Amino acid sequence: MTTLTAQQIACVYAWLAQLFSRELDDEQLTQIASAQMAEWFSLLKSEPPLTAAVNELENCVATLTVRDDARLELAADFCGLFLMTDKQAALPYASAYKQDEQEIKRLLVEAGMETSGNFNEPADHLAIYLELLSHLHFSLGEGTVPARRIDSLRQKTLTALWQWLPEFVARCHQYDSFGFYAALSQLLLVLVEGDHQNR
C-alpha cells in the first residue's frame, strides 16, 4: 500500500471488523450506500491493488439498495455464512481452519490488549484480528511506541491471519449467493495481502 496512510488502513480494518462481527443494522445499511461512503470507496480505489475488490463491493451495494427487505436478507446471509455449521458456511474463526486459536491471544497480550466482554465470540474470531491490525496501524501513526516493535507485531498478526484467510474468503465466495460478504472478504484479502507485502 503506497497512497493510503497508516490511519486510513487502520480505519479500513476497523470498518471491516465491524461488518464481520455482527449483522448490519438500518443505520449501517444507510451509511454503506451514502455519498460519504462513495467518497471513501473512491479513495480506496486510488490504491490499484484494491480497485477491483472495491468495484465489486460497490456493485453489491448498488444492488443492495434495490433489494427487497435488504436488511433482513443480509441478516439471513450473515447468519447462514458465519453462524451455522461449517458444512456450507464460512466460519470466521481461526480454529475452524485448523489454526491455533491461542495465537491471537498471545498477539493481544503482546500488544497490551484483551477482548471486550461485550463481544460474545471466541477470541479467534476474524473481527479480533482486524481490530488488532487497526490498533497497530493507528499506533504506527502516533509514534508513541517504537515503529519496529509495532511492525514486528503487525507482521506476526498478518502471518497468523494469512494462514486461514484465503480459505475463509474462498468459502465466502462459494456460499454467499448474493455476494455482499464475498465482496467484503475479497477486499479484506487484497488489503491483508498488500499490507503483508509492505514490510
Swiss-Prot record:
Family: Belongs to the TorD/DmsD family. TorD subfamily.
Record carries keyword Protein biosynthesis: no
Domain of life: Bacteria
GO aspect biological process, one term: protein complex oligomerization
Subcellular location(s) of the protein: Cytoplasm
Pfam families, per the entry: Nitrate_red_del
Summary of the function given for this chain in its UniProt record: Involved in the biogenesis of TorA. Acts on TorA before the insertion of the molybdenum cofactor and, as a result, probably favors a conformation of the apoenzyme that is competent for acquiring the cofactor.
Plastid listed as a keyword: no
Coiled-coil intervals: none
Protein's organism: Shigella dysenteriae serotype 1 (strain Sd197)
Cellular component terms (Gene Ontology): cytoplasm
Listed name of the protein: Chaperone protein TorD
UniProt keyword list: Chaperone, Cytoplasm
